[in-house]
Design a protein with these regions (language model features):
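Structure-specific DNA junction-binding interface
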Residues: 1-97
Length: 97
């Protein structure tokens, strides 16, 4: 049975992975690559989400893609799935609900 991706959690378990994913999100926002990440970030901020919460929501979408890339049955990275998940924020990707 394959495991589904889990939400980013606070605490010592997975803290390094969470920090790395949040750093990657920051890089995507700063570099405007892909531009849909910055668009999602700006939209979430306009909806009233804090800087940290907006980044964590985007990180949740990125974590799903990382899972799909690393898991043997994950099927690999899918840009369209990632961009689609960003458009749906603040609703989390289905695999995290």
């Amino acid at each position: 049975m394959s495991r589904r991706p889990t939400r980013l959690r606070d605490g010592p378990s997975g803290a390094g992975a969470q920090a790395a994913i949040l750093e990657a999100v920051g890089d995507q926002i700063d570099n405007d690559d892909p531009p849909e990440v910055r668009q999602a970030y700006e939209r979430l901020r306009k909806l009233g989400h804090s800087v940290g919460d907006a980044r964590k929501l985007i990180a949740a979408c990125l974590s799903v893609e990382i899972w799909h890339t690393l898991h043997p049955q994950g099927g690999g990275y899918n840009r369209e799935r990632y961009l689609g998940a960003l458009k749906e924020l603040p609703q989390l990707p289905e695999s995290l609900r």
